[in-house]
């Protein structure tokens, strides 16, 4: 079984320099220059969310999974107002430069998809294939409220079992998983801090999220319509963030995404079950043939 290598890259913000940690899964096929797949997580998650997907894809691809600023191994930002798409996008551009690749595939869950969509909308961007995991140019107010209810609470527990229980509650939208699957979802979401377990992200990421949520719906259709690369849209059939109408519209305009829905799943598909990994793998195979 392949294992990731922990690396870092130094990025800049208006407040100074910060390190972004990322996980590199070397390609196992022996190719001298395998295609690169960059996987970017959701709001409170981190790069280890993609372990199951990355392990499979690393048989044919070099897979890179960053912890965005304020999450996992990455530095916290001095100015919490910078926890927003423009800074994340700038950090990812720096990371892509470090990777020394001209073209890559992007797999983005929720926030990670918004970052990918933003980059793919720009001229001369490096994205050759885009996977948007349960996210689009219009986000449902219901889903945003649900996320806002827990993102800034920063709970802590005295046992990992309590962490698992809490994870099952807030991540119920990920769908049904066995015990091993829930452990994968919780293992890197929590970190031991003395006698307690705490979430592995800066609770201040909630501050700009709350401010944006209070400004009303934001349409990102101009960004989506500017995307030109092949695009796969994955949607949980019970998603409270990406509604059916928006998903359908995404198949009719812009890159005309291919839509795959997963029954019994809300926001968002975890990319742990085999059918979800199969969908990504098949799409990338077609794009890189």
Regions found by a protein language model. Give the residues of each.
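Active-site loop/oxyanion-hole signature of alpha/beta-hydrolase fold enzymes
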Residues: 23, 28-29, 52-55, 65-107
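Conserved hydrolase catalytic core segment
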Residues: 102-141
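Conserved serine/cysteine hydrolase catalytic core
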Residues: 192-249
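Catalytic histidine-centered segment of alpha/beta-hydrolase-like enzymes
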Residues: 265-275
């Amino acid at each position: 079984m392949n294992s990731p290598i922990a690396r870092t890259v130094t990025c800049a913000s208006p407040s100074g320099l910060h390190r972004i940690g990322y996980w590199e899964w070397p390609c196992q096929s022996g190719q001298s220059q395998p295609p690169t797949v960059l996987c970017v997580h959701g709001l409170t998650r981190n790069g280890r969310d993609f372990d199951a997907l990355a392990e499979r894809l690393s048989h044919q691809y070099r897979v890179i999974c960053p912890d965005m600023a304020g999450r996992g191994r990455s530095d916290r930002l001095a100015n919490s107002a910078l926890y927003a798409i423009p800074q994340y996008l700038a950090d990812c551009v720096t990371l892509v430069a470090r990777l020394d690749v001209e073209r890559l595939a992007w797999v983005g869950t929720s926030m990670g998809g918004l970052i990918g969509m933003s980059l793919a909308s720009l001229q001369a961007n490096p994205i050759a294939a885009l996977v948007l995991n349960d996210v689009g140019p219009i986000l449902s107010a219901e889903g945003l409220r649900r996320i806002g209810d827990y993102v800034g609470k920063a709970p802590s527990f005295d046992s990992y079992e309590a962490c698992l229980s809490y994870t099952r509650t807030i991540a119920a939208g990920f769908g049904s998983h066995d015990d091993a699957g829930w452990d994968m979802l919780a293992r890197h979401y929590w970190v031991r801090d003395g006698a307690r377990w705490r979430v592995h992200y800066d609770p201040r990421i909630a501050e700009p999220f709350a401010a944006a949520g209070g400004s009303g719906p934001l349409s990102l259709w101009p960004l989506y319509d500017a995307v030109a690369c092949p695009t796969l849209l994955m949607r949980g059939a019970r998603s409270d963030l990406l509604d059916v109408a928006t998903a359908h519209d995404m198949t009719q305009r812009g890159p005309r995404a291919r839509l795959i829905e997963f029954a019994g799943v809300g926001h968002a598909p975890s990319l742990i079950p085999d059918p979800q990994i199969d969908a990504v793998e098949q799409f990338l195979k077609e794009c890189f043939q």
